């Protein structure tokens, strides 16, 4: 997928002052219509996921059962949660602050990645996710002038993008170390010194939803 130029801007119809944007906002302001549209969109995402082998409901229940004991450790009582985090989000009336949103985020993200390539019905969810993330990272790469040592992913949700970014940065770090070792000048009769190990990479995720963080902890433990 080609990267968008830095100057790209969203289509003008998303603006509220555009006729289509105004119409969309008006339609969504009618509660029965909003509920119907969100319900249909949710069904579409779930149908895409389950049609490609993602067990949406079983995975949701598994994540919630494993994450509930981690909720207290993922909660910061002093954190000030902004209003938009409590606002209705997609099909979730409680926004990001609910188990349903947190325990379905992984499946929904995979489903959305699959929908980027509708012409490839055999595409596996993990392959679609990897392809999508690598397209994003390829757009980031030119702006990185040197090694990355520490990353904070703001609004990390359940860590799908966070873990993908960590893996990509580790690969980038290893490739740079290998290239540096090949470029070391050889001296006759002297064994080349081994390349210095790369500095540790720290990638952290930050989110104001304790439910999201609890699920992220479960997913991190699964990857170990």
Predicted features along the sequence, with ranges:
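N-terminal auxiliary segments of SAM/dcSAM-dependent transferases
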Residues: 10-106
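Glycine-rich, flexible loop segments associated with nucleotide phosphate handling
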Residues: 80-89, 125-130, 194-203
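Short, well-structured alpha-helical patches and their helix-loop capping segments
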Residues: 84, 124, 128, 132, ...
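Conserved alpha-helix/loop element of class I SAM-dependent methyltransferases that forms part
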Residues: 108-149, 164, 168, 172
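Mature, folded catalytic cores of secreted/periplasmic enzymes
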Residues: 78-81, 90, 101, 128, ...
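N-terminal chloroplast transit peptides
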Residues: 1-3
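Class I SAM-dependent methyltransferase SAM/SAH-binding core
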Residues: 150-183, 192-224
């Amino acid at each position: 997928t080609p990267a968008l130029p830095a100057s790209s801007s969203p289509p003008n119809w998303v603006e509220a002052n555009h006729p289509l944007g105004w119409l969309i906002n008006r339609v969504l302001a009618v509660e029965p219509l909003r509920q119907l549209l969100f319900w249909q969109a949710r069904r579409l995402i779930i149908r895409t996921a389950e049609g490609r082998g993602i067990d949406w409901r079983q995975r949701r229940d598994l994540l919630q059962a494993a994450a509930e004991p981690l909720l207290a450790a993922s909660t910061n009582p002093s954190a000030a949660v902004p209003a938009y985090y409590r606002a209705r989000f997609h099909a979730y009336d409680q926004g990001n602050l609910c188990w349903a949103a947190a325990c379905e985020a992984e499946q929904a993200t995979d489903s959305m990645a699959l929908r980027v390539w509708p012409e490839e019905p055999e595409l596996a969810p993990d392959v679609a996710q990897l392809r999508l993330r690598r397209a994003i990272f390829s757009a980031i790469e030119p702006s990185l002038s040197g090694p990355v040592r520490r990353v904070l992913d703001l609004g990390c949700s359940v860590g799908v993008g966070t873990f993908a970014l960590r893996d990509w940065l580790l690969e980038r770090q290893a490739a740079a170390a290998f290239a540096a070792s090949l470029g070391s000048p050889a001296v006759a009769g002297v064994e080349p010194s081994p390349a210095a190990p790369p500095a540790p990479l720290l990638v952290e995720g930050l989110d104001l939803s304790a439910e999201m963080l609890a699920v992220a902890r479960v997913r991190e433990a699964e990857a170990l």
